[in-house]
Curated annotation (Swiss-Prot):
Residues 152-238 form the RRM domain. It comes from the Eukaryota. Keywords: RNA-binding. The gene is RBP2. Probable RNA-binding protein. SMART domains: RRM. Pfam families: RRM_1. This is RNA-binding protein 2. It comes from Medicago truncatula. PROSITE patterns: RRM. Residues 242-252 have a biased composition (Gly residues). Signal peptide: none annotated.
Amino acid sequence: MADGFWNRQQQHLPPPGGMLKRPRTEYDTAPSGVTSGNEVHNYIAQNNGHQMLNDTKILGSAYDRFLQSAGLTSFNSGEASVIGGVGFARGVGELPGHSLGDPSAMGHLSGVGGGPDLSRNGRDVNFGGQLPIDAVSRPGPETIPLPRDASSTLYVEGLPSDSTKREVAHIFRPFVGYREVRLVAKESKHRGGDPLILCFVDFANPACAATALSALQGYKVDEINPESSYLRLQFSRSPGRRSGGPGPRGKR
């Protein structure tokens, strides 16, 4: 009796609400221009991976033959090299697990390229740590010898009559070894003429004085004034003297 009752009740029950909805096909397809996940999966599965693998093997074998013909050694791609203390993933043909400062790496590179060693402050040293013969016999940079009358004091002509010590010092102060500027005013030989300015510039040594002489020879004092005079410099013949004789080229 109970089974028959329940069977009749189930026959009169309405179907579930989900079954009443009509399936809509627009939800099953993705918008235009966008592929669904299944389509992407099918596309990846259809990709010809075997052909790509074969091409890679062909390139690798050709590269190995190139290294063998050039006398180089090929290494496994799983090795790593350390350059400057930082590890990098190494490609084919690099040194395994060595830094540029490692002597063993330097020895290997000398057998391959034999170039100069840049790890020792730019000196031309082989990877074996020995100086080449030409580097030992090579002379150093040539220096221009100073003239016999070179001194640590320069005598300067061509300064305007109204020049001040501060203005002249501003010209010579940028040079290495500069020490002092001394100005000596002399009365003009002509009545009413401008006074004559004798200028002496002291440096630490004759080499510093020669550098300033070479750089400032013919220096135009006033670039705006077209009639401005040009500096004329020479080594002072008597560096210890504080004043000169009569005339612009007296005893110096």
